[in-house]
Amino acid sequence: MGMGEPLLNYKNVIKALHYITSEEGLNMSYKRVTLSTSGITKMIKKLADDKVKVNLALSLHSVSEETREKIMPVGKSNSLIELRDSLKYYFSKTKKKVTYEYVLLRDINDSLEDAKKLYKFTKHMPSKINLIEYNEVYSLKFQKSTEEKTKIFMDYLEKSGVNVNLRRSRGKDIN
C-alpha cells in the first residue's frame, strides 16, 4: 500500500501497473493487483476507458455527503452521485467488482441507518465491503466503533446479502 492518491498520478501508476504485470517486470496477473483510491471520478472512468482491469478498492467511509466531506476532503470535489456513476461505468466496462473500504468511526458513520445507506449505495453492482476497525490515535478526535454497533452494522449487511468482511485493527500492543 502506497501513500497519496494514485489516480492523481495516473501516468506513473499506469507505468507501474505495466511493470508489475509484464513479463519483463514482476509478471503478476492483473487479477492479483488492487488499486486503492479515494474516488477521483473522472479518473475511475479513464481507467475503464483505458481498459485497465485491476481490482479497484474505494475508500468510501461514509455515504452521507456532509460526513464524507468532513472525514475525506476529496468528497468536496467528487460527489457520491458522481462516484456511484463512475463505479457503475467502471464495472460495465471491466466486469470487475469494486471493493468498498469503510472505517467504522464511533457515532460518525456506524449507525444502523449508515449501514442501510451503505447497502443502498452499493447494491447496484457486484461488490465487496471491508469494514475496518479504526486504529485509535489519541491526538485525533475519532474513536473506534463499539463491538455492539459493529456487530449490528455487519449483521445488517450480511442479512442483506452483501459480501462483507471485518478487518480488525492490529498492532494495538505497540506504543
Regions found by a protein language model. Give the residues of each.
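A structural preference for short, hydrophobic beta-strand core positions in alpha/beta folds
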Residues: 131, 166-168
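Radical SAM enzyme core and accessory elements
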Residues: 159-161, 171-175
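Short, hydrophobic secondary-structure boundary micro-motifs
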Residues: 29, 165-166
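Conserved AdoMet/S-adenosylmethionine-binding subsite of the radical SAM
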Residues: 2-160
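Residues at the C-termini of beta-strands that transition into short coil/loop
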Residues: 60, 168-170
